[in-house]
Design a protein with these regions (language model features):
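Residues forming the flavin
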Residues: 1-522
């Protein structure tokens, strides 16, 4: 008897997780094709990591100038529902019919009423380190991430607000002329049904504190690349000027150390793909601000792989940036002058040398976000050995997760620069649109048949299924295993493991196999 192909109806909407440039691009592509999109962003505003940078390589565009219009497009799009201060907490179902639960934390500010005048922040008595500036500046307990924030509304940090923690203050409520403060807002749980999911949760910068030889955290003038990026931003902690944290004066001699946390067997063996180029970009900004400054880049290999990147590299050399091929082994601070003394090897000269610098910049790489493991478990997506979310096939299905209907975009899958993140986001959106546009998806008849009379409800198959295609359900007086035919790939793990023989394959049954053996033996 031939096996019959089934089809299931698709919920014609999509969920995009992450409000950085990749998530924004994916959401706009899907919505522009006529489908409802729910964009979930953990923070109070869109923008992601790109929103923290001042300029982008190799064109030296203003990052906000090209990012902000897209953020506004998301907020104004009639088919995009933006959920900020929100995170995914539960997911079930399969391609075409995912059921998800979103936790939306209270902002304590009415987005519709808030005019972003800033009076509340001026009067707020609480100061805490500003995570946007990597702790180089402070912010208030009621704050806005940027003047370009979307939505353009303040948010109250519940962990540091005096009223929410101790029941005192409420000064922001008293001074707000728009009456936008609302301490009665509660956490919401939003349940959605979607046909496709795009995961674009981004990355975190590597924390170089464990590299004790570089003195990050001990020496004020040892900073990370992202910290220097914030200095170059006119809205950053130094108003766009690159300054020594110890003195507040422009540095005369700067060293960039490449591959910090990347291409290092102690931490991450992979190349983060952006560090060479952002170091070159920042070196040019330093030379623009102070042409007399000496800038050195200590590198292992310069990887200028993108369009216009090699030319950008050559431009920095022409500007007087010096490149030294070799690894810096240690940094120590002169107790009198406070200069940083670097010991390094110049592999081209074959000698070990020392030199002193005013400012040292650690070009840290990209690592998986802290919540990547949580997202992986909720959605059933495996991670590769480097901790990033794993694609279904590195060559043929680079945008697809192992779970059908879930797609990966940006640095959630592997370190990327902005052009590659945007390109993959559009690719993920195109893949997500296929089931949405079809309205129904065909299901191959690969799943096993569960004999409910023999099934004892032990749950062995549920624990072993690599695709989470089985679950225990109560049917009458019995608990039995049930197969989600869309999730099932027909691997046969449950058939082999079932102690009662209740799980049987649709193909290659015992009778069929014995018949083939009998025929072959004649």
């Amino acid at each position: 008897m031939p096996l019959e192909t089934k089809s299931v109806e698709v919920s014609r909407s999509a969920l995009v997780i992450g409000g950085g440039i990749a998530g924004i691009q994916a959401a706009l592509d899907i919505a522009d094709n006529g489908y409802q999109v729910y964009l979930v962003e953990k923070g109070p505003s869109l923008g992601g990591r790109m929103g923290q940078w001042s300029k982008v390589f190799p064109t030296m565009d203003c990052a906000a100038c090209i990012l902000t219009p897209k953020m506004v497009s998301v907020a104004r799009h009639p088919r995009i529902k933006l959920l900020t201060n929100s995170e995914l907490i539960e997911a079930s179902g399969s391609l075409g019919n995912f059921k998800v639960r979103i936790r939306k934390r209270p902002r304590y500010v009415d987005e519709e009423k808030c005019t972003a005048c800033g009076l509340c922040a001026q009067k707020c008595p609480v100061r805490v380190p500003n995570e946007i500036d990597f702790g180089m500046s402070s912010r208030k307990a009621i704050y806005i991430t940027s003047p370009n924030a979307v939505p353009l509304a303040y948010s109250i940090d519940g962990e540091n607000c005096l009223y929410l923690k101790r029941g005192i203050c409420r000064v922001c409520e008293r001074v707000c002329e728009a009456k936008a403060i609302n301490f009665n807002q509660k956490e919401e749980i939003i349940e959605l049904k979607v046909g496709s999911i795009v995961v674009a949760i981004g990355y975190d910068p590597f924390d170089p504190t464990p590299l004790e030889e570089y003195g990050f955290g001990r020496y004020k003038d040892v900073v990370t690349g992202p910290m220097l990026e914030r200095m170059t931003d006119p809205m950053g902690p130094t108003g766009g000027a690159i300054l020594r944290p110890s003195t507040g004066k422009p540095p005369r001699k700067v060293a960039f150390i490449q591959c910090v946390g990347s291409r290092d067997a102690r931490f991450n063996i992979y190349c983060s793909r952006v560090c060479c180029m952002y170091a070159i970009k920042d070196s040019l900004i330093i030379k623009e601000q102070n042409p007399e400054a000496e800038v050195y880049i200590f590198y292992m290999d310069i990887r200028a792989f993108g369009k216009g990147y090699e030319e950008f590299y050559l431009r920095s050399q022409e500007a007087g940036v010096r490149f030294i091929r070799g690894k810096v082994s240690s940094i120590r601070e002169d107790p009198k002058t406070k200069e940083l003394i670097l010991r390094y090897e110049d592999t081209l000269l074959g000698t070990a040398l020392e030199d002193s610098f005013d400012l040292v910049v650690l070009s840290v790489g990209q690592v998986p976000r802290a919540d990547t493991e949580t997202i992986s478990k909720i959605l059933g997506i495996p991670r590769s050995t480097d901790g990033f979310l794993m694609e279904a096939h590195p060559k043929l299905r680079p945008n697809d997760a192992v779970v059908d209907g879930i797609y990966l975009a940006g640095s959630a899958q592997y370190p990327k620069d902005i052009p590659d993140a945007v390109a993959q986001a559009s690719g993920a959106a195109a893949r997500a649109l296929i089931p949405l546009s079809m309205g129904r998806v065909e299901v191959e008849p690969l799943s096993p048949i569960i004999d409910e009379d023999r099934c004892g409800g032990c749950g062995v198959c549920v624990k072993l299924c690599p695709y989470r295609a089985l679950e225990l359900k109560r049917k009458g007086e019995k608990t039995v295993a049930e197969v989600d035919e869309v999730l099932c790939k027909g691997c046969g793990t449950c058939v082999a493991a079932c102690p009662s023989g209740a799980a049987k394959p649709r193909m290659f049954t015992e009778e069929q196999i014995l018949s083939m053996i009998s025929s072959a033996a004649r």
